[in-house]
Structures are given as structure tokens and as C-alpha cells.
Regions:
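Conserved ASCE/P-loop NTPase catalytic core
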Residues: 1-209, 216
Length: 218
């Protein structure tokens, strides 16, 4: 029996007005580039991000598409381009988690080289970036993420495209998402997340937000 996950209501979060405003602004205009939230444990960082799931709207996606492509848009993955007709279905915008220990293949996806060599066709195994397309990509403790994976995320977020290349075979798909990262300043003392490409930063202490304590955004 499938059980529904209970989320703390976004509207019930007390304080942290700057944090909530930063998240909502990114939902309204994803072109902002995401938000990096820094705060001690117990300051509702993860709670606020996960609470967004209940207030996100529904969008139209191509039925069966591994990347959630927009049936009304021009940016389509190779799978959609091969279809004779695109059927659309509605689903809610997703909040997709990226675990800190993820491998590169898990993040960007992988190509089945055996199928490519044997049958002469590309077979793509979607990764986290495909799941997060047109949604929110959430990285808890982003300061602990491998530097190479940080570069992968920032490149995909900036370009809006994820490209997987293996042995001369490539697959590109739309990768448009709001990148939300959280970090604990105590754990970040020895390893800071680099400041690159626009976005917002927010520092939270207790129930009050401190703009002076905000780190550089992603």
C-alpha cells in the first residue's frame, strides 16, 4: 500500500522570511539561478525546501519522456524527437534530491555502450539531472559535494542542457532546473563552496535571517 509523505506546511514556517522569499522568488522566476542557504542545524533549511513540494503547480510533460520535456516547447530530448506524435500528461513540478555521495553517472545519466555497438542505436539511462528537468534540484550539504560534480551542476544550470558523451556517442537533453543548496557553516569552515555564476545567498541563524551572514550564491 502506497503511503503519502507528510510535509510540514510551507505557510506554517515561522520566521525565516528572507529564506522563504528567496525560495518563492526562484519559483516565480527560475532565471534567478537558484539559492544557497546557509544556517545551523534546526533553522528549517531542509524543512522549507521540502515544504515547497505541496505548493508547486502542475505542468504538461511528454508522456513517457525520460526527461519530462515540454510538449509545447522547442527544447526536446532525442527520445521525443524520434516520436511521431507527442502525447502530453500533467504532473506536479518535482523536488529532486541529489545525495552527496552520488556518482557522476548517477547525476548526468549513462549510455548503454553495448546497445550502441551491437544495435547501432543510443540507449540512455536517465540520471538525476533528467529527473530534475523543469523542477527543483535540492542538494543538502552542498559544500560536501565533490568539486567536479559542483561544476557539472553549474554548467547544466547555466546552459540549460545536459550532455553525456561516451566513446564518441553523445546524448543531450534539456536540463532546466532551480538549484537549491543548503550548508551548515560549522561544517563549511574547512571547505567553502565556490562563488560562481549568479543566484542568491541566504544566511539563517535561529528563527531570524541575517543578510550580513549570507554566503555567495550559486
Amino acid at each position: 500500500m502506497k503511503t503519502l509523505r507528510q510535509r510540514y506546511p510551507f505557510s506554517a514556517i515561522v520566521g525565516q522570511e528572507e529564506l522563504k522569499q528567496a525560495l518563492l522568488l526562484n519559483l516565480i522566476y527560475p532565471g534567478i539561478g537558484g539559492v544557497l542557504i546557509r544556517g545551523e542545524k534546526g533553522t528549517a533549511k531542509s524543512t522549507a525546501v521540502r515544504a515547497l513540494e505541496a505548493i508547486l503547480p502542475e505542468i504538461d510533460v511528454v508522456d513517457g519522456c525520460p526527461c519530462g520535456c515540454d510538449p509545447h516547447g522547442d527544447a526536446l530530448c532525442p527520445w521525443c524527437l524520434e516520436q511521431e506524435a507527442l502525447e502530453s500528461v500533467s504532473r506536479q513540478v518535482r523536488v529532486v534530491d541529489l545525495p552527496v555521495g552520488s556518482t557522476e553517472d548517477r547525476v548526468v545519466g549513462s549510455l548503454d555502450m553495448e546497445t550502441a555497438l551491437r544495435e547501432g542505436r543510443r540507449r540512455f539511462e536517465p540520471g538525476i539531472l533528467a529527473d530534475a528537468n523543469r523542477g527543483i534540484l535540492y542538494v543538502d550539504e552542498i559544500n560536501l559535494l565533490d568539486d567536479h560534480l559542483v561544476d557539472v551542476l553549474l554548467d547544466a544550470a547555466a546552459m540549460g542542457v545536459n550532455t553525456v558523451e561516451r566513446e564518441g556517442v553523445s546524448w543531450s537533453h534539456p536540463s532546466r532546473f532551480v538549484l537549491v543548496g543548503t550548508m551548515n557553516p560549522e561544517e563549511a569552515a574547512s571547505r567553502q563552496v565556490r562563488s560562481v555564476r549568479g543566484g542568491q545567498g541566504h544566511g539563517g541563524t535561529g528563527s531570524a535571517a541575517s543578510g550580513d551572514d549570507a554566503p555567495c550564491g550559486l
